[in-house]
Regions:
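A structured beta-alpha segment of the ubiquitous adenosine-cofactor-binding alpha/beta core
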Residues: 1-20
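ALDH superfamily catalytic-core signature
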Residues: 15-21, 27-169
Length: 172
């Protein structure tokens, strides 16, 4: 097991002819980069993606809201299986009750140090930057904040939960 940066040393190691395969847990862009360095190299990758929860009109809205909050904000949303996209179908989309349950639960999450037993959501692994910072602070055209995330600390590791609406297919 070797932890490799995306620099010249990483490129040299990944593209070396004696490397039989690469197993990667990381970003899709990193997997593509590794393949660009050596096209014949098998890259077995678990990459980031859009994990979705679909809620239909037949769903138990109480259970759906609880599952959405846990899946989206557990581990500060940093788990590879975190739900980053919620799809509400039919009446579920129009349900003010479901919307309020989700927003009330998200806005009531207590953010703080993991050593504080009252905390329900801890810090980001590192200060928000790049795509993550953009996701916490910027909206794409047509999107709105249903619940705008707020930076809580100076360093940028603690953020309140955020919920955006108006997501369209193809949005990042």
């Amino acid at each position: 097991l070797v932890d490799v940066e995306e620099n010249e040393a990483g490129k040299h190691l990944v593209s070396h002819p004696e490397v039989d395969r690469v197993i990667l847990t990381g970003a899709w862009e990193t997997a593509k980069l590794f393949r660009s360095w050596r096209h014949d190299l098998p890259v077995l990758a678990e990459t980031s993606g859009k994990n979705s929860i679909i809620v239909t009109e037949n769903a138990d809205y109480d259970l759906a809201a609880a599952d959405i909050i846990k899946a989206a904000f557990g581990n500060a949303g940093q788990k590879c299986s975190a739900a980053s996209l919620i799809i509400l179908v039919g009446q579920a989309y129009r349900s003010e009750r479901l919307r309020n349950q989700i927003l009330d639960a998200a806005s009531s999450i207590r953010v703080g140090s993991p050593s504080d037993l009252r905390s329900q959501m801890g810090p980001l692994a590192e200060p928000a930057k790049g795509k993550l910072l953009d996701g916490l602070t910027k909206l794409d055209p047509g999107q709105v904040w249903a619940l705008k995330p707020v930076r809580i600390d100076k360093e940028g590791r603690y953020w309140s939960p955020g919920v955006r609406g108006g997501i369209k297919p193809g949005d990042p």
